């Protein structure tokens, strides 16, 4: 399994890590957040599994995350989609992520919307994902 995440404040990475490492403790992490690093292209085969996690800003996946996800291709590769939002609303972000990933050769097998501490208004969903969320995310991973 490959865990790919865009996580400027760390909440998205935390949710992705909980889910991904529960499914496959040997999963590799690919951080597409850092704009100063060379953004590599990745080609995953049908035997791989992709877990991709992105934050939601204003109900959308950040455009920079979409651009970076376009460098990852699959070949009918199973994908688990994770959107992380600050307890407001994730609007169409899950659909937007699904459309992007499937146009790159992946097949969505599961989706989840997770709550994490809001990236600007830290008082909303403060400290999340917390231990209760971790239990829920691990249960999701077992399905």
Predicted features along the sequence, with ranges:
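FMN-binding flavodoxin-like domain, especially the glycine-rich phosphate-binding loop
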Residues: 1-3, 9-35, 40-143
């Amino acid at each position: 399994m490959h865990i790919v995440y865009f996580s400027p404040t760390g909440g998205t990475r935390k949710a992705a890590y909980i889910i991904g490492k529960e499914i496959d403790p040997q999963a590799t992490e690919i951080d597409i957040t850092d704009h100063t690093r060379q953004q590599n292209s990745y080609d995953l085969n049908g035997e791989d599994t992709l877990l991709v996690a992105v934050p939601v800003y204003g109900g959308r996946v950040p455009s920079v995350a979409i651009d970076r996800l376009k460098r990852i291709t699959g070949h009918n590769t199973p994908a688990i989609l994770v959107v992380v939002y600050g307890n407001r609303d994730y609007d169409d972000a899950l659909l937007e992520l699904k459309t992007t990933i499937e146009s790159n050769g992946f097949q969505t097998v599961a989706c989840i919307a997770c709550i994490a501490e809001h990236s600007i208004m830290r008082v909303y969903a403060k400290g999340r994902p917390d231990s209760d969320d971790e239990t829920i995310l691990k249960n999701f991973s077992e399905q």
